[in-house]
C-alpha cells in the first residue's frame, strides 16, 4: 500500500537520519552532526474517545513479523524481544512519568515507513519522535522540538533499554543538518549549509551492534587508566582526563600534548584515543564549511593533507566546498576503519565503488560493521550513478536524498 493512498484524520511524518560527521563520539560527550534524509515514516491516526492505543505497522505485517499492539495510558510493561510496540509503550511511559498522562487520549495508529529497519538510518528514533509529535499534536501537550527529542531518547534508552545516545532523536526532531552538543544542556546549532545531495547505500549486512560500543569504550577506559596511573603524565593533563570514556574534556586535549605519553598503553587503547582526538579535529574543520566560514589552502592542508588538497584544488570553484566536505568524509571513514575497526571488505567495496563513479566522499553511517554508507554527490543524477555502482558490488539498496525536514504535521 502506497503512502499517497492512505488516510487518517491526523497524519504525521518523521525523517530518517544519516550519521554525517563525528561518528562514535556522542557517548564521549563530544558534538555530533546528523543530517535528516528524505526517507520518512508516516503515522496515520484516528483519535479515540477512550484511553486505549492501537498501533499497526504495515511494513512488519508485510514481512510476516509481529506488527500490532494494544495498550492503555499507564506505565506499560515492555514485552521485550525487540518488539516494535515497546517503542510506542516507552513514549507513553515517559509522558506518564512527566505527569502528562491525564492529558493523553487513545489513538488508532497505522504506520507506513520508507526507512528500512536495521540499516543504520534511525527507524526507531523516527518511530519514537513521530509518535511523540502525534501525541503532542492530538493532545495539545505544547512540546518543543527538544522535548520531543528527549522523550524519544528516554523511551529508547530508559524504557526499552537500548544503550543509545541522543544523536538519532535530535536529528529526527530538528531535521536539516545540526550540530548537537552531547553534554547538558544539549544545545542544538542548526547549520546553514543545506545544498547537499547524498546517496544512501544499504549494504544489506546486519551485524549486532550490542558489543560494538562496549568494546571500544572498554579500550578507551583501559588507556585512560594507564595514563591516570602513570607518574610521567603532567598533572595539568590529568586534570583534563579521567578514568572512563565520558569523563575527559576531549576538546581541550591536543594530540601533540598527549601523543608522547600514549606508549604507556596497549595499541588498541592508543588507537581509540587517537581516533577520538582526530575525529573531533576533523569535525571542527568541517563545521567551518557548514557555517559558510572562509578557509584557505594552509588550513585545508593542515587538516586533510597535501594529497586531499590536490583533489580539492582541481575541482571547479563552485564545487570546492562540496569537495572539501567529501574529503572530510573520506578522512573520517579512514579513521573509523583504521583506528576504530568498524569496516568490512564489503563496506570498503561500496565506498570504493561510490568514489570510482564520482562521489565527493563516502563513509560509514552509524555503528559500523554493516548498515549503511553515506556518500556526498553532486546531484541526483550522480547519486543514481553511485547507487548503480554500489549495487553492482553487492549493496542491497540505495536512495538519493537531499537534506530532509524534521518531524512535522502533514494534516489534521
Report residues per predicted region.
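C-terminal nucleotide
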Residues: 2-17, 21, 42-86, 96-97, ...
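DPxDG-like acidic metal-binding loop motif
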Residues: 36-39, 121-141, 374
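Phosphate-handling active-site elements
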Residues: 97-106, 135-151, 379-392
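A short glycine/serine-rich beta->alpha loop
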Residues: 8, 27-31, 72-81, 113-121, ...
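Alpha/beta catalytic cores of group-transfer enzymes, especially the acyltransferase/condensing modules
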Residues: 142-187, 362-365
Amino acid at each position: 500500500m502506497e503512502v499517497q493512498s492512505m488516510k487518517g484524520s491526523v497524519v504525521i511524518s518523521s525523517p530518517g537520519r544519516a550519521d554525517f560527521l563525528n561518528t562514535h563520539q556522542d557517548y564521549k560527550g563530544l558534538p555530533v552532526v546528523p543530517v535528516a534524509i528524505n526517507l520518512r515514516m508516516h503515522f496515520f491516526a484516528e483519535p479515540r474517545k477512550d484511553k486505549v492505543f492501537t498501533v499497526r505497522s504495515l511494513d512488519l505485517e508485510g514481512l510476516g513479523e509481529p506488527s500490532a499492539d494494544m495498550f492503555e495510558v499507564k506505565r506499560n510493561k515492555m514485552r521485550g524481544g525487540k518488539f516494535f510496540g515497546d517503542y510506542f509503550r516507552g513514549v507513553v511511559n515517559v509522558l506518564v512519568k512527566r505527569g502528562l498522562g491525564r492529558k493523553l487520549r487513545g489513538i488508532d495508529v497505522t504506520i507506513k515507513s520508507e526507512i528500512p529497519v536495521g540499516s543504520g538510518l534511525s527507524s526507531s528514533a523516527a518511530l519514537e519522535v513521530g509518535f511523540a509529535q502525534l501525541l503532542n499534536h492530538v493532545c495539545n501537550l505544547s512540546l518543543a522540538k527538544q522535548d520531543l527529542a528527549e522523550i524519544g531518547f528516554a523511551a529508547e534508552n530508559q524504557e526499552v533499554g537500548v544503550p543509545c545516545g541522543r544523536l538519532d532523536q535530535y536529528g529526527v526532531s530538528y531535521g536539516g543538518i545540526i550540530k548537537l552538543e552531547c553534554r547538558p544542556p544539549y544545545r542544538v546549532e542548526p547549520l546553514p549549509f543545506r545544498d547537499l545531495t547524498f546517496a544512501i547505500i544499504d549494504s544489506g549486512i546486519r551485524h549486532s551492534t550490542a558489543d560494538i560500543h562496549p568494546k571500544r569504550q572498554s579500550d578507551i577506559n583501559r588507556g585512560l587508566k594507564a595514563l591516570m596511573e602513570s607518574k610521567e603524565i603532567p598533572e595539568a593533563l590529568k586534570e583534563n582526563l579521567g578514568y572512563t570514556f565520558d569523563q575527559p574534556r576531549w576538546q581541550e586535549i591536543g594530540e601533540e600534548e598527549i601523543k608522547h605519553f600514549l606508549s604507556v598503553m596497549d595499541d588498541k587503547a592508543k588507537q581509540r584515543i587517537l581516533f577520538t582526538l582526530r575525529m573531533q579535529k576533523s569535525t571542527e574543520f568541517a563545521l567551518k564549511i557548514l557555517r559558510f566560514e572562509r578557509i584557505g589552502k594552509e588550513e585545508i592542508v593542515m587538516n586533510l593533507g597535501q594529497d586531499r588538497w590536490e583533489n580539492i584544488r582541481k575541482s571547479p570553484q563552485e564545487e570546492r566546498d562540496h569537495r572539501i566536505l567529501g574529503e572530510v568524509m573520506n578522512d573520517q571513514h579512514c579513521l573509523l576503519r583504521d583506528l576504530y575497526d568498524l569496516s568490512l571488505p564489503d563496506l570498503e567495496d561500496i565506498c570504493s565503488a561510490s568514489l570510482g563513479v564520482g562521489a565527493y566522499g563516502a563513509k560509514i553511517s552509524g555503528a559500523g560493521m554493516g548498515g549503511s554508507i553515506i556518500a556526498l554527490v553532486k546531484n541526483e543524477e550522480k547519486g543514481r550513478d553511485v547507487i548503480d555502482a554500489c549495487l553492482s558490488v553487492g549493496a542491497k539498496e540505495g536512495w538519493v536524498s537531499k537534506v530532509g525536514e524534521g518531524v512535522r504535521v502533514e494534516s489534521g
